[in-house]
């Protein structure tokens, strides 16, 4: 996920904790009174009976919260202004359409929160949050990330990596050398929190049939990192190749007898910008659904670390299932089975090489999409009910939100009319923004305080769905594929203190 801007790449469905013995408190939530293994119990999160925020809670909440989302008729902005309100119902919530179109996807905020960046069919666009002015920033964009200030780093096959801003010309950052009969692409741009390291995957493509429309992927050329010189912002200090290039594609196929060969790409940085989490992806859809390999690059020592060591475990290959916590501890969903999302456990991996992994017990639950508080004391996640022996999975999977503290697991949501999924922690750590799906497939965006108070609906997405035109990037209805919902690149969150 990121201290100020959180980008949601894919929504996950969540399931109600069923069959839990215990009492029902006055807020309507259940509490399990008995110990479930040594890790603790499952209960309802503490909420005031009248639903209002107490003074301590109000101080912790952001004064303003902005949420971008892409519907199939345009890009929308939700503005939440608390303005001293005592509860969620009194906070001012407004929704406006920033840009029209049926081809908008992958929205995200600039680091200062003043610009919305997003994809259209012809490229990467920016739109001013204040004026609504829209501008094409890069034709044919492949990848883009906020640049730590008011603009974005972006890449295309023609330009390489550039820095783009609204109302200003592009600034060249790094352009690959020409390739005879093809070109090099810089993909999966990933900027460190301190803004000094920009990692990317470099891939070579060739035109084997002399037709640009029939070009083929040829070779992974490793993961690279630009060490930025912030005193001379347009210059580079160091260009480092983190992982070397692989043999060309067809040579690899001969070497491996057609077995899938991993495609390595950078995913997330640690909060202190010293470590980079890397996926070892595969082309096989069935293998990918069960999980893939991972690696961590330590920029201080210049060494690569295998976070799972010699364990025969794989990780669900979605960025929302991996997060760094305090002290560079890594939290991810790992397991060795073939039941995709349903046999994975929440694992905490200490930063020390070779350290013993800790499997965090979530009794009766199958977690997904963890978020870690900035003090490292709380873990928030979506979870479905654990299947009984012999029970068959039914899609879509139903989930709810939970919080874990000191081994104690508490429900944050428990409305059986909704599946609550993919929580995203705001930059100040006080609010979770998440998606919900009802039993008819309707989608909506909600927020809740991390202590379980202030549950609030922010927008009904189905109200903005056009019936005569369809955004090819936007799901017409909710579908759950291999235990992961199809809300891909719909939402971005920005909180103001």
Describe the predicted segments one by one:
Residues 16-19:
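C-terminal motif of bacterial Sec signal peptides marking the signal peptidase cleavage site
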Residues 13:
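Short glycine- and basic-residue-enriched patches
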Residues 24-497:
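Sequence signature of WD/YWTD-type beta-propeller architectures
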Residues 1-6, 10:
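Positively charged n-region of N-terminal signal peptides that target proteins for export
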């Amino acid at each position: 996920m990121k201290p100020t801007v959180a980008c949601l790449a894919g929504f996950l469905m969540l399931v109600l904790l069923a069959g839990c013995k215990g009492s029902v408190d006055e807020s309507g939530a259940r509490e399990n009174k008995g110990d479930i293994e040594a890790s603790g119990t499952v209960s309802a999160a503490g909420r005031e009976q009248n639903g209002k925020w107490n003074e301590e809670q109000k101080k912790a909440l952001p004064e303003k919260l902005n949420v971008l989302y892409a519907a199939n008729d345009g890009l929308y902005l939700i503005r939440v202004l608390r303005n001293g309100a005592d509860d969620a119902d009194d906070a001012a919530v407004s929704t406006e359409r920033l840009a029209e179109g049926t081809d908008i996807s992958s929205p995200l905020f600039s680091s200062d929160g003043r610009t919305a960046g997003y994809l259209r069919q012809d490229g990467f666009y920016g739109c001013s949050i204040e004026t609504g002015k829209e501008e094409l920033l890069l034709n044919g964009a492949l990848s883009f990330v906020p640049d730590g200030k008011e603009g974005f780093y972006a890449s295309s096959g023609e330009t390489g990596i550039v820095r783009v801003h609204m109302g200003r010309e592009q600034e060249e950052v790094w352009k690959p050398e020409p390739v005879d009969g093809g070109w090099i692409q810089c993909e999966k741009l990933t900027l460190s929190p301190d803004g000094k390291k920009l990692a990317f995957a470099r891939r070579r493509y060739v035109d084997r049939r002399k037709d640009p429309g029939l070009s083929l992927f040829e070779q992974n050329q490793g993961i690279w990192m630009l060490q930025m010189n912030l005193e001379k912002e347009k210059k580079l200090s160091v260009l480092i190749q983190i992982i070397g290039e692989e043999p060309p594609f067809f040579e690899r196929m001969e070497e491996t007898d057609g077995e899938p060969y991993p495609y390595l790409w950078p995913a997330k940085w640690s909060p202190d910008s010293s470590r980079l989490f890397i996926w070892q992806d595969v082309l096989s859809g069935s293998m990918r659904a069960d999980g893939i390999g991972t690696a961590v690059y330590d920029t201080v020592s210049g060494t690569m670390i295998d976070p799972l060591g010699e364990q025969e475990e794989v990780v669900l290959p979605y960025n929302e299932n991996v997060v760094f916590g305090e002290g560079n501890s890594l939290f991810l969903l790992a397991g060795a089975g073939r039941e995709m999302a349903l046999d994975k456990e929440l694992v905490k991996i200490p930063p020390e090489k070779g350290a013993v992994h800790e499997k965090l017990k979530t009794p009766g639950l199958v977690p997904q999409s963890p978020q870690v508080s900035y003090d490292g004391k709380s873990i928030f996640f979506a979870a479905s009910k654990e299947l009984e022996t012999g029970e068959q999975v039914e899609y879509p999977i139903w989930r709810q939100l939970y919080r874990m503290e000191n081994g104690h697991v508490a429900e944050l949501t428990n409305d059986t009319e909704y599946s609550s999924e993919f929580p995203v922690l705001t930059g100040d750590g006080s609010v979770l923004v998440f998606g919900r799906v009802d039993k008819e497939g309707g989608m909506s965006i909600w927020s809740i305080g991390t202590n379980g108070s202030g549950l609030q609906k922010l927008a009904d997405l189905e109200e903005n769905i056009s019936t005569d035109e369809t955004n090819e990037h936007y799901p017409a209805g909710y579908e759950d594929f291999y235990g992961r919902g199809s809300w891909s690149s719909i939402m971005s969150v920005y909180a103001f203190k």
